[in-house]
Amino acid sequence: FSFDKLAKKLDLMSNVEDFVKCQYEFAELTGITPTWSAFYDDGMATDATGFYTGVYDRIHERYADASSIDWQDEVFGGYAMTQSHNVNISTGTEKTQVMLSYNYNGQDGLLANHSANKSAFRAKINSELYKGIRLDVNAMFNNKSVDGGGSYSGMKYVLRQPISGGTYFTRDQMLTEQTYVDFRGAESSYTASNPLIQNEASTSNKRSRMFSVNAGLEFDFLKHFTYRIAGSYRWNSSKSTSFSDERSTGYLMDPVNTGMTGSIGNSESYSYQITNTLNYNQTFAKKHKVNLLLGHEVSYSEDESNSISVKQMPYPNHGIDDISLGNVEEKKSGHGHSGIVSAFLRANYTFDERYLLTATLRADGSSKFAKGHQW
């Protein structure tokens, strides 16, 4: 077990008085002083007597001792636990060895709704079934789940969110309410969104599984010959989901046409390979070594995927569990497959452990090539 925390924070403005002065000067330059007054000067009219001549005095009186909100600390200031567990078992006899292992890794994110978990199981067997007959098997299964933040844009919101709510928001409101509508509604250049709320509003998850197995069987016969048949199989499956509720910026910017959104994506693939080889080894007159390898190989792969994105979902409590409640925004699907057949011959000649001659002949046929040109 271990615990992680944010190693270093960005050096950002933390003095509220300086921050409000900066906002005022920016508002003056961009012509949005009334908007600034609404948020930081209790809505005082810009044409009121003493507005401009006394603005810095009012800023000092209100904000000289005001405490700031450290958004980096609020969002990333906690501790995240990482854990790892391993179990290994080895057993066997003189002719058979078996190894089993299980591994689990779990990591919580410093940011809420972010984590990663992975478990893996592996089995390995090597055995001499009979004299001159050998078997080897290697299998693995992985299961992985990653929770992310959906459309949450991370540091952008942390950096843009004001360190003070001025005279418009209390500190508690800044921390617990989605301020995006008020800021954006007052002035389009104010794109600040509460990073804590936005992170809760937009969530995502991706789960993936993988299974693979490799196996081979070897036969020694006629003293100098070895035949091996080997095969492998691999399967992958993944599912990804995302959902943004009524507190997300997408909903707040356009609650009617966009509303709450969600997506589901699925993909699956598998592949296999079968290889047959015949190997011949012989030494003549102690100096002449000959090795011949004749082989045949077949491989095939297939994959498919589908995804759907919906908008205008009416009920946040259903999340992405019932996409029929929303309107389809986009849908996709895909499918593909390919195969390869190969035949090969390799000859090696070694003289006196000093000179080597190699010759190779190979032919491949692929389903990806046009008909009539597949070899």
Regions found by a protein language model. Give the residues of each.
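Outer-membrane beta-barrel architecture
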Residues: N86-S90, S101, K124, N214-G216, ...
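Outer-membrane beta-barrel initiation region
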Residues: V75-A80, I89-T93
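Outer-membrane beta-barrel channels and translocator barrels
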Residues: T82, T93-E94, Y130-G132, D220-L222, ...
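Conserved interaction-surface patches within small, structured recognition/assembly domains
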Residues: T82, N86, G106-Q107, A343, ...
